[in-house]
Regions:
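Hydrophobic alpha-helical connector segments
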Residues: 41, 56-85, 136-143, 175-178
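C-terminal peripheral helix-coil segments that are non-catalytic and often amphipathic
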Residues: 78, 111-127, 145-191
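Helix-turn-helix
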Residues: 3-37, 41-42
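Short, charged helix-capping/linker segments at alpha-helix termini
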Residues: 10-11, 130, 134
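Helical hydrophobic small-molecule/effector-binding pocket
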Residues: 44-51, 67-95, 118-119, 144-157, ...
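Generic detection of well-ordered alpha-helical segments
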Residues: 2, 44, 48, 52, ...
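Short secondary-structure transition hinges
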Residues: 77-118, 122, 137-140, 166-171
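Short coil/turn segments at alpha/beta junctions that flank glycine-rich nucleotide-binding fingerprints
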Residues: 6-7, 61, 83, 127
Length: 191
């Protein structure tokens, strides 16, 4: 996973990985089939290394769906500081791979739901936090897409310094954006 995180999908070399592991390059291809197969397995491990929505503390869960969403969004920076390797692999998989591999990644995310988004949305509906008249799959997709993209935007400055020039290093502005994002989502799907 580290090779992909440091060098990207295109830059990572199977030869380097095999050398570091002390095995033949052919062994990697025999097991994973291709570099894409190896990356896909690294992506899956990275996804399952991230916390699921409902792994928030009980006190947060007791406050409901939107409090839990807020809790995780406010902790987005830990993805870069504490768990940068898996998060970087996720970013590369989401934005830096070819369409065939991206299709496999999308199928994995839908079929395996590594973040537990379906269960999280059902939790919100059962509590009455989320409108019951909305299609469950639509709400799950919205939460997945919007939260993922928003988290990526929150860490963009960390990943690509200088991309955003205005309001740099203003944590209060970031906190306000997180709360505004949760409020927009609450107005869209909240009951």
């Amino acid at each position: 996973m580290r090779h992909f995180a440091e060098d990207g999908y295109q830059g990572a070399r199977v030869e380097d990985l095999a050398e570091e592991l002390g095995i033949a390059k052919g062994s990697i291809f025999q097991h994973f089939g291709s570099k894409a197969g190896l990356f896909f397995e690294a992506y899956k491990r990275a996804a399952f290394a991230q916390p699921a929505w409902l792994e928030a503390p009980n006190a947060v869960l007791d406050d409901g769906f939107f409090a839990t969403l807020l809790y995780w969004l406010e902790r987005t920076e830990h993805l870069i500081r504490d768990d940068w390797i898996p998060y970087r692999v996720l970013l590369i998989g989401n934005y830096g791979t070819d369409l065939k591999l991206k299709r496999d990644i999308n199928r994995f995310l839908v079929s395996e739901d590594p973040y537990g988004t379906l269960e999280f949305v059902e939790f919100g509906q059962q509590r009455g936090d989320i409108r019951g008249d909305l299609d469950l799959e639509l709400v799950v997709s919205m939460v997945d897409w919007l939260a993922e993209r928003f988290q990526d935007a929150l860490v963009t400055e960390e990943l690509d310094p200088g991309l955003f020039h205005r309001h740099k290093d203003r944590p209060e502005r970031q906190r306000a954006r997180i709360r505004q994002f949760v409020e927009i989502l609450r107005r869209a799907i909240g009951s």
